[in-house]
Amino acid sequence: MAGTSETPISLLASDLSTYISDAASRPLPEAVRIKTKFHILDSLAAILSGSRLRAGLLGAAYVAPLDGAGPASVIGTNLRVPPESAALANGMAGHGDETDDSHLEGRFHPGCAIVPAALAIAERENIGGDDYIRAVALGYDIGARLTLSLGFARPDTSKHSTHSLAPAFGSAAAGAALFRFTPQQVRHVLSYAAQQASGIPFWQRDTQHVEKAFDFGGMGARNGVASASMVKAGFSAVEDPLSGKHNLFTAFGEDPRPEFLGEELGVRFEIMRASIKKWCVGSPIQAILDATTALIADHGITAADVRKITITMPDDRFHIVDNRTMPDICAQHLCALAIVDGGITFETTHDHARMHDSAVLAVRAKISLLPNAELTIARPARQAIVEIETGRGAFRHHARAVRGTPDNPMSAEEIEAKALDLVAPIIGKARGVQLVQAIRHLETLPSMRDLRPLLVA
């Protein structure tokens, strides 16, 4: 294929495209392979449960007119649509709420976009489980490094949304690997991903978790699949979108460090730094619930005991969860709910009616949520302190390493139990157990199409 640009190809673009080109053939370290399967299971469970939430229902309805026009499954339905459409619908379901995984350093939710994007192309190409696992791990590597290389500062000051940029490039890279593109074709995929790059963080004002689901999951998955599919169809592109005049970093970089995009590829696997949520709520609330439930368990605290609650959390994410109108991302509501019920479940965290429950509101009125700069720089990140004053005394818990993060990972049993709890109401417990077992041995699956009977509902 003839080059379409006279700009010399940078060493970064050359090395990165070669790495992506070889990814589907490159064995992963055993620990990386195992953890990737955990994130695939967690993401598929999030998509299945999200298929019954508003964002998931709307995504499926949007692509439903294309039923029968393509090979890719819309999870939780019987629809079969073009890959780009399946990626969009499944991506929106994957972030239909706050069940899906996250990556703290990369500041994005990788699984809700990369897992369905790679699945759509794997179904199209009839690709097996082992290659699929490698492509997903690659997507996490590229997505996280992309936002790190752009050098954004705090989440509350960034003008571009890392939660939209990273999924698009991660999904595009995964697709390029599954298509087994040459390095030149990979660079063309990255060029189309760069042209589609977008995302403004006013998703923080979304009150229905629909646009947010598109921004975090559906858009990046769709655009990544489209970027790879266009090159598969023969589209040519600029040879190096990472250097030269008007490149990715000059357009989106805040304090760009392009070298971060290729840093320690094949040595540091970003999926090992990704987190699986114990609680199906916004990431900044994980530590708050860890601390609250610990106090309930350790001291038998009930709603009747509470006189005052003080929650201290990092100031850079305070705005994301302070008195929000959606139950699963409102810190005050979830803390109060946990105390009233003695814990929380997926169902209670998504029950809008409980936001008007008089018992919950009574406890919530006693809560003060405080931003703290020291907790923002504390490591491990996203710590929280909950202090509860009762008639029996004052009790305090400082949650440092959030459950499900690399510093305090969930066990395989916990991850599989979470997934089963999420999918059983949709596909039944028996098929849920089959899905868990299939992902446990995913590298032996001859074709990702073989998962279809376990993902329809």
How would you describe each model-predicted region?
Residues 1-107, 208-225, 229-457:
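Terminal-appendage/accessory-domain detector
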Residues 93-150:
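Hydrophobic alpha-helical hairpins/lids featuring a short glycine-rich hinge
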Residues 104-111, 160-165, 200:
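Short helix-coil transition sites and intra-membrane helix breaks within transmembrane domains
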Residues 116-128, 166-184, 216-236:
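Active-site-proximal alpha-helical scaffold in enzymes
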Residues 124-136, 180-187, 237-240, 300, ...:
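Structural helix-adjacent loops and short alpha-helical linkers that scaffold large soluble proteins
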Residues 142-169, 217:
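Aromatic-lined, polymer-binding surfaces characteristic
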Residues 169-171, 204-209:
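Acidic/polar active-site rim loop that often engages polyanionic ligands
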Residues 192-201:
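Flexible glycine/proline-rich, aromatic-decorated loop/lid segments
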